[in-house]
Amino acid sequence: MKQYLITGGTGMVGSQLVNEIKKSDSHITILTRHDQISNDKKISYVNWAKSGWEHKVPQNIDVVINLAGATLNKRWTPEYKQTLMLSRIQSTQALYELFKSRNKAPKVLFNASATGYYPPDLFMSYTEVYKTLPFDFLSDIVYQWERFAQQFEQLGTRVVIGRFGIILSNEGGALQTMKLPYEYYIGGKLGSGQQWYSWIHINDLIQAILFLINNESASGPFNLTAPIPERQNLFGYTLARAMHKPHETWAPSLAMRLILGQMSTVVLDTQKVLPNKIQALGFQFKYSNLKIALEDLISK
């Protein structure tokens, strides 16, 4: 039986990942910030906001999956920016300290990250060979998160970092926010509309995470995005068609930056990111085409 330890296991990605892992011979310990009782013999909850939580984590953990982090979908006040950073760094450091104090480190750590690692560009195509230093707040979060995760290599753990693109899911996240203006018939171009949206269907993301965990030759950063990113204007048009709504309005960049503040970078300052590394290992995406991905989700 394989033992998993998961942070963020009750979130959008984590909950679907847990449901998939349960299909195998496994036991899952989920770290949460509140007391929770499990009705499933394959799942245990540990409240790591309480003192002594470390002693409740099983000794023989094989796989650590670190997804914990405050949502980006809130206004980035100075106080919340600190929460965004610390929620990721402190949880990762706490995991590292836990296993550093034990004689048995996990075989593999899968640590979430984001395509915000790469600088925004209308023409550049980014693969995993591109390396950079932080250039804005979001990239600094990503850079520091990855750096703290890489400490696990000192313990002999194989470290896999998944740079998530825009996750398309019916259970929350970006797609629900994107759909909202179209439901009120005010969807359309954002800014220039030329910025890239590197997206991934939630089902492909779950399978990609498990593929990387189970592939012993996988290590380092992986771009977890569909092979065919789209520019925002075409993305919005495709979404509108799937929803049978118009795609006619325009929100200027200046207005969006004034309304959203720094959070507007998530929508306007984006990157064209390609999943070369995971494809080279043989992973096949079920949803490479945006039209098919959106129709699958919106039809449900």
Curated annotation (Swiss-Prot):
Lineage start: Bacteria, Bacillati, Bacillota, Bacilli, Bacillales
Name of this protein: Epimerase family protein SAB0724c
InterPro entries cross-referenced by the UniProt entry: DUF1731, Epimerase_deHydtase, NAD(P)-bd_dom_sf, SDR39U1
PANTHER family: EPIMERASE FAMILY PROTEIN SDR39U1 (PTHR11092:SF0), SUGAR NUCLEOTIDE EPIMERASE RELATED (PTHR11092)
Gene3D superfamilies per record: NAD(P)-binding Rossmann-like Domain
Record-stated family: Belongs to the NAD(P)-dependent epimerase/dehydratase family. SDR39U1 subfamily.
Organism: Staphylococcus aureus (strain bovine RF122 / ET3-1)
Source superkingdom: Bacteria
